[in-house]
Regions:
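Conserved non-catalytic scaffold segment of RNase H-like nuclease domains
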Residues: 2-117, 155-170
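Conserved protein kinase catalytic core
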Residues: 29-31, 141, 181
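Conserved glycosyltransferase catalytic-site signature
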Residues: 113, 136, 173-176
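Active-site catalytic microenvironments for nucleophilic, acid-base chemistry
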Residues: 119-123, 142-145, 160, 182-185
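Short alpha-helix plus adjacent loop in nuclease-associated cores
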Residues: 133-149
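Juxtamembrane/interfacial segments flanking transmembrane helices
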Residues: 150-154
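Acidic, divalent-metal-coordinating active-site segment for phosphoryl/phosphodiester hydrolysis
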Residues: 171-184
């Protein structure tokens, strides 16, 4: 596929494509075993940094027995709050449509992308995103590499940049909004 063409054949230069800032909450760290339980998404205009669209969706886990208890504590998962959660296939269908031709961005791109990629594969939903990835961690590292950090997580970076910290429990849309505010810096 031509790098400057959308899936419909429209010409869109890479610097004109939207950015899909994504955060996933999962039942653990291993994308091959654990599952997505929440997806947060902020689509922004790359030039203006204005928000175009958002997504905040809880996903019903199919194999909660494989969950890591610490992960569930961090993201606040509980059966009551997830009573009306949708299936992974439904969530990825919505996510896939919203992110069409967008460039994937995350604070920890390897982690979030591995779960999103696996979810596209598992559900059979076609990934129509641009093949490039933006790693917010790397962008921040370049800006703050001469600073001293005990931890280099999203909240520590937010504090350094004057962005409000993400509230706990860690929710996907809150992580995404914090990442968006950091991206704008």
């Amino acid at each position: 596929m031509d790098n400057n063409k959308t899936k419909e054949g429209k010409t869109t230069h890479i610097f004109e494509r939207p950015i899909a800032i994504t955060d996933v909450e999962t039942t653990g760290l291993d994308f091959a075993i654990q599952e997505i339980v929440e997806i947060g998404l902020v689509i922004i205009n790359q030039k203006t940094l204005e928000i175009i669209d958002t997504l905040d969706v809880k996903v019903k886990p199919e194999h909660i027995k494989t969950a890591n208890e610490f992960a569930l504590k961090v993201n606040g998962y509980n059966e009551t709050d997830w009573k009306n959660a949708i299936t992974l296939k439904e969530a990825m269908s919505i996510y896939g449509e919203k992110t069409k031709d967008a460039i994937f961005c995350a604070h920890n791109v390897t982690f979030d992308w591995s779960f999103i990629f696996e979810a596209f594969r598992k559900t059979g939903i076609k990934n129509q995103m641009d093949h490039h990835r933006i790693d917010l961690f790397t962008m921040i590292w370049m800006k703050l590499r001469n600073s001293s950090f005990e931890k280099f997580n999203l909240n520590e970076v937010a504090k350094r940049l004057g962005v409000p910290e993400e509230p706990m429990p860690h929710r996907a849309i809150n992580g995404t909004m914090t990442a968006y505010k950091i991206y704008k810096k």
